[in-house]
Amino acid sequence: MSIPDDLRYTKDHEWIKLLEDGSAALVGITDFAQSELGDIVFVELKPAGTKLKAHEVFGTVEAVKTVADLFAPVAGEIMEVNGSLDAAEVVNQDPYGEGWLVKIRIDDPASLAELLDAAAYRELIGE
C-alpha cells in the first residue's frame, strides 16, 4: 500500500498536497481508499468556483461495489477539476498522480497541520 510521506491525510481517506505557491493544493483519494472501493467507474465533482468548508462533501466516487462521498480536507475554493477523470480508472491506476481530483485554493494553509501525517495515516488503516 502506497502512502507518500510528503502528503497529509484525512480519516475519510483523502490526501492533500500543498503546491509550491503555498496557497493551493491538490486533493485525491488514497491508495487504500481506491483499493477498498474496487474498480472506479465514475467520479462526480462540484465545479470550479465552488467554496468548501472543511469536511464538506465535494463529490462522489462510484465504484462497481459502492458509491462513496468525497470530503474536503480543508476549507477553500475549487480552482480546477481534473479533466482526466472522464476515464475514471485513472484514480485506481495512479491515485497520487494523474488520479488527483480537484485543485483548491486553501483558506488557511495552517489548517493542514490538523491533518494526519503519513505515519498517523498508516496507523489509522492498520499498516
Swiss-Prot record:
InterPro entries: 2-oxoA_DH_lipoyl-BS, Biotin_lipoyl, GCV_H, GCV_H/Fam206, GCV_H_sub, Single_hybrid_motif. It comes from Chlorobium limicola (strain DSM 245 / NBRC 103803 / 6330). Keywords: Lipoyl. CDD domains: GCS_H. GO terms for biological process: glycine decarboxylation via glycine cleavage system. This is Glycine cleavage system H protein. The modification N6-lipoyllysine is found at residue 65. Signal peptide: none annotated. Binds 1 lipoyl cofactor covalently. Transmembrane segments: none annotated. Residues 24-105 form the Lipoyl-binding domain. It holds the Pfam family GCV_H. Belongs to the GcvH family. The keyword Cytoplasm does not apply. The glycine cleavage system catalyzes the degradation of glycine. The H protein shuttles the methylamine group of glycine from the P protein to the T protein. The lineage of its organism: Bacteria, Pseudomonadati, Chlorobiota, Chlorobiia, Chlorobiales.
